[in-house]
Amino acid sequence: MDVKPDSKRPSVAYFSMEYGLSHVLKIYSGGLGVLAGDYLKEASDSNADLCAIGFLYRYGYFTQTLSMDGQQIANYEAQNFGQLPIDRVLDEKGEQMVVDVPYLDYYVHAYVWRVNVGRISLYLLDTDNEMNSEFDRSITHQLYGGDWENRLKQEILLGIGGILTLKKLGIKKDIYHCNEGHAALINVQRICDYVAEGLTYDQAIELVRASSLYTVHTPVPAGHDYFDEGLFGKYMGGYPSRMGISWDDLMDLGRNNPGDKGERFCMSVFACNTSQEVNGVSWLHGKVSQEMFASIWKGYFPEESHVGYVTNGVHFPTWSATEWKHLYAAHFDENFLYDQSNPKIWEAIYNVSDEEIWKTRMVMKLSLIHISEPTRRSYI
């Protein structure tokens, strides 16, 4: 853990609405969060220079139970932050750090917490404090909870608040990675910062594009976040002047068809327009995403766009049974966990006998039976 990050690779700031690290920390709901959590764990194992931004939800996503007639019941259970594996981030006065995020004509105040994911620092924002109104305290109550206005307030906190958090921490990175369009507004704040330093808008957006990466998970347009111009303008109306552009210019960055006043602002379109690299999460999904976003780049074929793919992976130590870990430790290179993309290391599997693999498989099968049989009986 004391080894310094690999300076030969670009440093990364990662933004996501959810992280699946452990069932103890209820800040995830499904695959998007599990991928993000594994991403941080793998970054730690491979000694990448990375930090991450997310939310510390008071209730997280709901816990599912079933009624006697088989209907789903959603239970929201409050987390006791004092019993979680998290640390308060302190300011220069020794008090818990607070980030002030502008909303309309007032500020929302977010506490900053840290989760140590191996070598990686995950900073979590929390608005459930007495400095905020009842409505703003609820911004970080539930993952994907509330109406569209609350969703926009969450995405402002993640994007704009996330960048302000890094600034307050004194952290600068080479690449800014949006895990889904929820974090797209990081590039609004980054453009504002560059313009405040004396750059023109055109210079600022090129710098932002060159250092931004957007990962899209959703395969259909209906799954992306769209905001009516009235609602979006209610909270974002003050930003165009700081960016050096007009309101229509900002809206057009989030439209498939710039100039169409009836089209809503799409976070995913904005992310595509302000990111040099966009990737789907499999080869097929990359192709689907090229078609889905094709209308953004008029006059180009879908395959000519900068939308590619990186196939989803998992964090090996998290998802491997202890028995398999012992087998790999006995036969694989000691650097296996730190260089899993090296095919030569994987060739060691051919040195493992069929008998040993079969024995391990049967041990796991018996373990599954021991788990599943009592569960089966309880439902009969």
Regions found by a protein language model. Give the residues of each.
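Extended, Lys/Arg-enriched charged tracts that mediate electrostatic binding to polyanionic substrates
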Residues: 69-115, 280-288
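A conserved hydrophobic secondary-structure block that centers on an alpha-helix together
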Residues: 22-53, 132, 144-178
